[in-house]
């Protein structure tokens, strides 16, 4: 079995790691960075991911073709409250797909969130392949612990579109605990993983038991908020800067996409700086202009001001901590270690609030940007058989059930149940002689069915006519290790059965995914052709420039007819270079090389002549060097 890589597919940044020996290792990308910005830019002929995509964002078109924070949309419906909020703040267009999902618009076409996220995963795959020197097909991908079934399934779809076989989906805090606890000794531990990333927040309570060298990582409880993260902190500061500028200049920058992009980048930079300094200046010259001339932004921001802007967001993250502890039947005194994961945890206020809640400082020996990918790589090692002494017991974050009479949700699997798990329950009909039942699958904690997340529904038909309450319909929930749900319903009398793997009521069908996989492969081929064409054009440029220089240096030594042949070949190559036919360019390069053979001979003769001349001068100098200068003193003979 080949290497199984670990990928942290983040809202703001992504990271890839692999097990190197018995230790997880983060792999640097082509730009030399250990994390890659989850930014995708579509330009003419190619797709840029990471820092190159961010550069396009700033320099060319900041809105239409540059996408970021797509993880906030993955597996979500367009009508979701969180999506509607994002529509107001995102510079790109969020649209409603035919199936009701939240998609984005780029390159003049609608694109599914998994399809866009697949571009980041492809970059992670290529980064790993460049490092390992072999093709990579297997991956463990992490998701926020509080992702619902639809979001986890959509993440798995993104992996398939990227050409990866997703061996396992695991929760981000669980992965961080794996990375942290792998080389720790000293008995059993109960750890709290506080994970505040770019777009999501999770808290997991995890117990690490060690028996005879084998470690068991058991998730006791998890909670969170899938729409709370660093992007929300950024937006608070962005709005403050825009409002202040409006007060000073009377100009609303929200109507200027390019200006807003500059403000966004400046706000992110200021937020980071304020983690290590008490104040900073946001200085943006020529941020916009009106009839009176150019306008500049220069606003001083203090750490105290930033903290006042985001205090409620930090406070919002503390509520899930209380719920998770209660679900685990623990108190803060039972927590051995606190681990901070996610870039936003670098903010001093976040660290202070978490320390205050747990009554202890968080560990400092965990890299918040890399721990999740490293843990995913450990799980990859477990699945590949490279790690033998680790057992991971993850949980489902939300309860699963079906809608029953009276629009009530009846739970079959309670939240925080260890996965994989299987549960079944027998139901009956609500009316006499009912020949079919609809199984409506739900996820959530509310008793009223409509307040929970609808995962899908299907019909079981052909039930024998009988009084209400007599038929026995056995519903089975089978939740796999990825947290993906498989549901079956069986009429115990007739033996008729219906099975489905739950997809969101919407989501991508297998046909959709297969089409996107083919598109990705087609783009891969197109990208390769684009790169080959660019290389051919560059070679043509070099050939034209070099040949013209040699013609000039040859001067009258080059016969006129040879010069005409060369000029004609150059002209033909210039024409071919403007086209898109790589083979035509290569052929004209070869033709120019043939036409310039006489020129090469002349250049060689001139070089030999210069060398010979240089040798003669050197010999002359050598002879002169053999003459020894001496000082003379005339001695007069006094003897006469």
Swiss-Prot record:
The keyword Iron does not apply. Residues 607-640 are annotated as: Disordered. Keywords: ATP-binding, Chaperone, Nucleotide-binding, Phosphoprotein, Stress response. Residues 607-622 have a biased composition (Low complexity). Coiled coil: none annotated. InterPro entries: ATPase_NBD (IPR043129), Chaperone_DnaK (IPR012725), Heat_shock_70_CS (IPR018181), HSP70_C_sf (IPR029048), HSP70_peptide-bd_sf (IPR029047), Hsp_70_fam (IPR013126). CDD domains: ASKHA_NBD_HSP70_DnaK-like. SUPFAM superfamilies: Actin-like ATPase domain (SSF53067), Heat shock protein 70kD (HSP70), C-terminal subdomain (SSF100934), Heat shock protein 70kD (HSP70), peptide-binding domain (SSF100920). Signal peptide: none annotated. Induction: By stress conditions e.g. heat shock. The modification Phosphothreonine is found at residue 200. GO terms for molecular function: ATP binding; ATP-dependent protein folding chaperone; unfolded protein binding. Residues 623-640 have a biased composition (Acidic residues). Pfam families: HSP70. Acts as a chaperone. Belongs to the heat shock protein 70 family. This is Chaperone protein DnaK. The gene is dnaK.
């Amino acid at each position: 079995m080949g290497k199984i890589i670990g990928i942290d597919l983040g809202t703001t940044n992504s990271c890839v790691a692999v097990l190197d020996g018995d230790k997880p290792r983060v792999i640097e990308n082509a730009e030399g960075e250990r994390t890659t910005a989850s930014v995708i830019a579509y330009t003419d002929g190619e797709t840029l991911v990471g820092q190159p995509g961010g550069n396009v964002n700033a320099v060319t078109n900041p809105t239409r073709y540059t996408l970021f924070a797509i993880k906030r949309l993955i597996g979500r419906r367009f009508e979701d409250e969180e999506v509607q909020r994002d529509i107001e703040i995102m510079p790109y267009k969020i649209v409603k797909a035919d199936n009701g999902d939240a998609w984005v618009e780029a390159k003049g076409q609608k694109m599914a969130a998994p399809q866009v996220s697949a571009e980041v995963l492809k970059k992670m795959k290529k980064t790993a392949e460049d490092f390992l020197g072999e093709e990579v097909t297997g991956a463990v991908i992490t998701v926020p612990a509080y992702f619902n079934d639809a979001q986890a399934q959509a993440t798995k779809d993104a992996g398939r579109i990227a050409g990866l076989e997703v061996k396992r989906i695991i929760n981000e805090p669980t992965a961080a605990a794996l990375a942290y606890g792998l080389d720790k000794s000293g008995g059993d531990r109960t750890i709290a993983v506080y994970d505040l990333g770019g777009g999501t927040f999770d808290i997991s309570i995890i117990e690490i038991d060690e028996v005879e060298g084998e470690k068991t990582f058991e998730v006791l409880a998890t909670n969170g908020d899938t729409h709370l993260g660093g992007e929300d902190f950024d937006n608070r500061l962005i709005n403050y800067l825009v409002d202040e500028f409006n007060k000073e200049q009377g100009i609303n920058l929200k109507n200027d996409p390019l200006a807003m992009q500059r403000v966004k980048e400046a706000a992110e930079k200021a937020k980071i700086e304020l983690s290590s300094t008490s104040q900073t200046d946001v200085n943006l010259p020529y941020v916009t202009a009106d009839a009176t001339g150019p306008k500049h932004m220069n606003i001083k921001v203090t750490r105290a001001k930033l903290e006042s802007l985001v205090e409620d967001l930090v406070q919002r993250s503390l509520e899930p901590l209380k719920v998770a502890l209660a679900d685990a039947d623990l108190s803060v005194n039972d927590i051995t270690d606190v681990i901070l994961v996610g870039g936003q945890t670098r903010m001093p206020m976040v660290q202070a609030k978490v320390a205050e809640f747990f009554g202890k400082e968080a560990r400092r020996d965990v890299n918040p940007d890399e721990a999740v990918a490293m843990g995913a790589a450990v799980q990859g090692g477990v699945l590949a058989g490279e790690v033998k002494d680790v057992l991971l017991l993850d949980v489902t974050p939300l309860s699963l059930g079906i809608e029953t009479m009276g629009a009530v949700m009846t739970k079959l699997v309670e939240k925080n149940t260890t996965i994989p798990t299987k549960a079944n329950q027998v139901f009956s009909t609500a009316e006499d002689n009912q020949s079919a039942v609809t199984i409506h699958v739900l996820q959530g904690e509310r008793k009223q069915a409509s307040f929970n997340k609808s995962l899908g529904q299907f019909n079981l038909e052909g039930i024998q006519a009988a009084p209400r309450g007599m038929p026995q319909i056995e519903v089975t929930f089978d939740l796999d290790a990825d947290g993906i749900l498989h549901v079956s319903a069986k009429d115990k009398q007739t033996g008729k059965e219906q099975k489905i793997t739950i997809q969101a009521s919407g989501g991508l069908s297998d046909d959709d995914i297969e089409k996107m996989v083919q598109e990705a492969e087609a783009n891969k081929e197109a990208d390769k052709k684009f790169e080959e064409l660019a290389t051919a054009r560059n070679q043509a440029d070099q050939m034209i420039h070099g040949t013209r220089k040699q013609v000039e240096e040859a001067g009258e030594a080059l016969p006129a007819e040879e010069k005409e042949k060369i000029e004609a070949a150059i002209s033909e190559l210039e024409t071919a270079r403007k086209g898109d036919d790589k083979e035509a360019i290569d052929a004209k390069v070869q033709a120019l090389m043939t036409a310039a053979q006489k020129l090469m001979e002349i250049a060689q003769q001139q070089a030999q002549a210069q060398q010979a001349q240089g040798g003669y001068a050197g010999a002359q100098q050598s002879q002169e060097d053999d003459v020894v200068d001496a000082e003379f003193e005339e001695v007069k003979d006094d003897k006469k």
